[in-house]
Swiss-Prot record:
<dbReference type="InterPro" id="IPR037147">
    <property type="entry name" value="Ribosomal_bL28_sf"/>
</dbReference>
<dbReference type="GO" id="GO:0006412">
    <property type="term" value="P:translation"/>
</dbReference>
<protein>
    <recommendedName>
        <fullName>Large ribosomal subunit protein bL28</fullName>
    </recommendedName>
</protein>
<dbReference type="InterPro" id="IPR034704">
    <property type="entry name" value="Ribosomal_bL28/bL31-like_sf"/>
</dbReference>
<dbReference type="InterPro" id="IPR026569">
    <property type="entry name" value="Ribosomal_bL28"/>
</dbReference>
<dbReference type="GO" id="GO:0003735">
    <property type="term" value="F:structural constituent of ribosome"/>
</dbReference>
<keyword id="KW-0689">Ribosomal protein</keyword>
<dbReference type="InterPro" id="IPR001383">
    <property type="entry name" value="Ribosomal_bL28_bact-type"/>
</dbReference>
<keyword id="KW-0687">Ribonucleoprotein</keyword>
<comment type="similarity">
    <text>Belongs to the bacterial ribosomal protein bL28 family.</text>
</comment>
<dbReference type="Pfam" id="PF00830">
    <property type="entry name" value="Ribosomal_L28"/>
</dbReference>
<dbReference type="GO" id="GO:0022625">
    <property type="term" value="C:cytosolic large ribosomal subunit"/>
</dbReference>
Amino acid sequence: MSRRCDLTGKAVLTGHLVSHSNRKTKRRFLPNLCNVTLQSDVLQRSIRVRISANALKSVDHRGGLDAFLLKARDEELAPRVLELKRQIVKAQAEAPAAA
């Protein structure tokens, strides 16, 4: 399991831990990843994803998983979530035709 956010693409960064005397030792900055279950209103089901805490706030801010995925760039999304985005777009296209 990689340490990468499924929605925003945030990953591990490397840098230095700098002491008071300015000595530098290598360190890793890990993303704050959470395993969460989000509800898709269009697909009428819940989806389990591993996302950063920042992405969780962004999903809430945009009004849910469906709205977030529709605005998100495809390059940032994990392949599994990208397939989910395509399913949402397809379901939305079929919904007005059925109504």
